[in-house]
């Protein structure tokens, strides 16, 4: 198969980003029958797969299989990916002698048919083409270099550790002990927490070229332009020879220029004009000719998942230290990264700047009636949004580096606003006292997050007539910067002239517009916002106006005629628990609510509102149905025909009511009995209206700034909001806490915990409430929750310090702050104080000493305690971090990692010995440890709803055991994601993981391993090398590698996962117990009994320590420990372990279960073996065969693999492919039959 074919295949097969797991979609997101066809595809166009031939301008022709709906531009990318053509960039595609349009679909090309031939024709160079060509040359040569320390810490070039692990064994080679036995840092009980193992090992550098630069003789003078000169380049080869090269319209050639003398004519020694710089270098530099093929080989060894850039910027909190001797010069990089006016698209886009708002709105409004139209629309919108976020990230870093001038430079720095690359940037401070009554800067900071939540909510409505702004939030170096697209004409008008809906003076004056009413009515209904009437007063005249949203939301009609809605910070109802003057439930009062909070913009999450409304609807249906059932029962008991008739009529009308509710339609009951039942149920569930069920929220009902009309029943409206907040406090939080105690959910780090809280509709500010309910438990989640409270409180404190720090003090201040946290700093920083003192004396001016320089350990810890109490409502009693971590068994390295990640700090990966008592009195961190800062990015993340629906259908199929149907649904979901997102996206790892598990239970081991490998690589690159989701992917990968009998390949990911768990959390976690059980079982399989016993005992000890309920897997681990002891000859210990197994099975299943009987039988066998062993030991002589002393039969590999399936949460019947290994080890013949299997992919379902 040709390389081009491989490229297209790699894109189309299921390839595997978990900020994040795919959450369950809203009500209309696929909760239909699994086999229900999609009836909304009247004009679905069937895509065809065709075979074409491409004839490059260099090299042989090759065939390519592709879908006819692909863009011609993708064929260009295919040519740039091929080894033979990747170095040629200036060309066009021709069909039958006619140039092909780049941006058209393949099937739209005139004359295009299956089997046709496209010819590649080299085009004349322009300066734009020349610059793009040099960029491609630089990208190709980068594959031979190690990590580039010049790149910003927030880039699209993430690395993967898994690519350095060889899962496949070398042929005809037995695995060495070093391939099987664990490294020291992966042993149970290891105290080493070095970050050095976290980094990806770098291969040997392949340097093909020293430098390539634009010549100082540029641009070509007029006479030379007229002869075709485009650009002049200076190239320094590895032989230290400098070649002066002319780029002309025909290509590149060596010219006669020398140092100090300009002569761009063709060199007498080399008169050839080459189509690319690569071809030129291969002819003039022997070193380049030797190394370049090795670079290409290294590039081709990487799959698309490993080498393609990520859609959104990613960053790492650790990196290699700066090495001056390895700091290579790169003139092209120097130009690109030191010119702040460059936006990164000049060479690609026509015109000067991109109109982000126009691109975002145009793609958002594209038709979406059929699946093919939705795929094209989603792909276009996602691509432009990703480009927008990347551009905004670059702009934010340039702004805080001081490289971009504010549009209001004369005002205070906190009020500065910026426009760069058609993006509007503002800082998260309270300018002009806009949020003075709501909390000042704290409210301004929070308003951006709640506004983004509103944008996300409105974006899910898919109403093309209602537009929102492109928006992204960046937390960088202590600042919060908001990036927004610009509404056409907004900068040319006053705000009063622009706003046609909402209020610009905090609710005193409100304007409304019928056009917006029509658009907002449906949006408000879907978002459960209650339309309400307010009183607007202007010039002494009062007027009643209807609002469908909060008064804070503003409607603006842009010059492009589009209707925009912005300032959506009050799209969700307020959280009354954090409003001082609000009424709360009695249960909330007993818990200390309402309580003071830094701001008054706290809002409930949309997930909570959906769950609350669903709960109240269920209660309403149950109450009304009970009323009618009681009537039916009464009529039957009395045998009264009149009552029987009334009951039948009521039952019929109630059925119509329930049908109307399910279809989200209004229904007016006419039956008196049904009316009474509805009124009684509405009174219980606190419906907005007395006579019909309506559960909607007035976002302004607790606002003191706006006046409601007398017709509004504020008491009922407020009651519903209070009930929703009470539902959060009395049901959702206790439910989550119990799930954490029972290990039903197992978050690994703070990011996982935040995701789980958000999925359950719980805001992060309730961390303290969860912490209070866990602080006296032995749950694994206790140290995780409490350490996250400390980390987030530290972030709040340090943020206030960082905004006062100048750029030249960032390294010193950050290292000093970290020393104050993790070592003992009794006195202010002497270095900073001396520097400030000398500067003040020299300048003769009064200068305030930096806030960080006077910071000590006790002062910083007290500030953290104060923030924890005020923000999270969690009082920290410990008077130092040291005592706090000891009291709650928190690992310092895990806390250190979390603080660095939430601060956005990148440090040198080394062993900081935070748990070393001797290091506490000295400075652990120095300035050289601080590498850089990176922005933490939040943005609206577009998604493909069709793919999510198919994934949910696949999950439903899995839940009923329809494995093949589930595989098809999830595979289709992954194909849709690939069409929309490309090769990588955060939602893809979950799909690939599910496909891998389904392949595994269906007996397709190779597919399972392939899919899971892609999932793990994608998780590493998109979520993080040490992310919680990445650890889970490693465990699954090891499972499937063991299924393929790749023993070293299964152990290496597990050792990596154990090291990461030790770093990210510590040992006392159920996932660590799972990892140790996996390692112990695999080592037991290869008869490394001593090492296996360490891991199995560790797994058992962890399970008991964290109070995990006894389950099937607990008994299996005890049984494995018993068998390992027996294999080592320690029958007494084996009996003790097996007795525990018997007790667990008896407790779980009762006395007559097969597992109980099996354990009882094994106990008898062990007892007999122990007696026999003792007798033989007493008669031991020189003629005794040692192997005869051990009569216990080890379990088959098939049974061990069944055990591994249960430990990892997979129930599988029949394991094909393992019988051969079982025969080799046990000398037995077992039939392995492939049976129809049902997959239960949830740990708790198994137990």
Curated annotation (Swiss-Prot):
Where it mainly occurs, coarsely classed, is: cytoplasm
Q: Which SUPFAM superfamilies match?
A: Hypothetical protein c14orf129, hspc210, TPR-like
Write out the biased-composition intervals (Polar residues).
30-39
* Alphabetical keyword list: Cytoplasm
The segment(s) forming the Clu domain are 329-579
Q: Which Pfam families match?
A: CLU, CLU_N, eIF3_p135, GSKIP_dom, TPR_10
An example Gene Ontology biological process:
mitochondrion organization
GO molecular function term, any single one: mRNA binding
Q: Which domain of life is it from?
A: Eukaryota
Q: Does this UniProt record's set of keywords contain Cytoplasm?
A: yes
Q: Where in the cell is it found?
A: Cytoplasm
> What's this protein's function?
mRNA-binding protein involved in proper cytoplasmic distribution of mitochondria.
Query: Entry's PANTHER family?
Result: CLUSTERED MITOCHONDRIA PROTEIN HOMOLOG, EUKARYOTIC TRANSLATION INITIATION FACTOR 3 SUBUNIT EIF-3
Q: What is this protein called?
A: Clustered mitochondria protein homolog
Q: Which organism is it from?
A: Caenorhabditis elegans
- Lineage in the entry? Eukaryota, Metazoa, Ecdysozoa, Nematoda, Chromadorea
